[in-house]
Design a protein with these regions (language model features):
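Active-site-adjacent pocket scaffolds in enzyme catalytic domains
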Residues: 1, 17-19, 71-173
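Short, well-structured secondary-structure segments
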Residues: 1-56, 179-183, 190-191
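C-terminal domain-boundary segment and adjacent tail
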Residues: 2, 45, 163-211
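A cross-domain feature marking catalytic cores of carbohydrate-active enzymes
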Residues: 9-13, 52-56, 84-87, 108-110, ...
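Acidic-and-aromatic substrate-binding clefts and catalytic sites of carbohydrate-active enzymes
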Residues: 15-20, 25-34, 55-65, 84-93, ...
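A general structural detector for well-ordered alpha-helical segments in enzyme core domains, enriched
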Residues: 35-39, 64-72, 95, 165, ...
Length: 211
């Protein structure tokens, strides 16, 4: 927030009994933990948005999405409308339809896993077409253009190269007054990863009004 940038923080809110697969694929924190509730309030009152980070198996299940959304809302104390599917798990046929059925209204799942870019071919938010209902889906979508792993795991950039790479994508979006999402996982800001310097460079580029 000190950089003049607000964000959407997505939280996992699973309440089912853990199976081995869920231990392996999903986060392990408890959204009803009092310390996490305090963090949710702090984010909300600092002007940020809180969204749902559904479980690995929720991408095609509206009831599961609705249940997880409700659990997060109970901890947050207000309505949740944003989401991004875990592991970017997504189906053109089912995911948007089930998100809308669950009461979610904004999704930022659509992106490439291993490279940066506009997967919907343009820097804009939109309501995708529902071929089953012959009308638009009742959910808005924003393409996620950059993910932290694109910069470190899928490319062998130097620090300067990463900075230039990020800035070029941000400039491209700003030039057309577009809309896009940038995905950064909070655990990579720890000393174990040390990606915090690049995260701060990204915030500076976003807030730089001269770009």
């Amino acid at each position: 927030r000190s950089a003049g940038v607000s964000a959407v923080y997505h939280f996992y809110s699973e309440q089912r009994r853990k199976t081995f697969k869920r231990w392996l694929m999903d986060p392990s924190y408890e959204i009803k933990n009092e310390r996490l509730k305090i963090l949710l309030y702090e984010l909300k009152y600092a002007g940020h948005k809180v969204g749902l980070h559904p479980t690995y198996d929720a991408w095609n299940d509206s009831e599961l999405l609705k249940e997880q959304k409700k659990t997060l809302e109970e901890s947050l104390g207000s309505k949740v409308t944003y989401c991004r599917q875990h592991w970017l798990r997504f189906s053109w046929k089912d995911t948007w339809l089930n998100q809308a059925r669950s009461g979610l209204t904004q999704d930022s799942t659509l992106m490439f896993n291993d490279r940066s870019g506009f997967r919907n071919s343009c820097a804009t938010s939109w309501k995708p077409w529902n071929p089953k209902g012959h009308k638009e889906h009742q959910i808005g979508c924003i393409s996620s253009v950059i993910m932290d792993s694109h910069l470190f795991d899928y490319n062998n950039f130097s620090c300067c190269e990463r900075n230039e790479y990020m800035r070029n994508w941000i400039i491209e979006c700003k030039k057309v007054h577009g809309t896009c999402s940038l995905l950064w996982h909070p655990h990579t800001l720890t000393k174990d990863y040390g990606w915090d310097e690049d995260y701060n460079m990204m915030l500076e580029a976003i807030s730089d009004k001269e770009l």
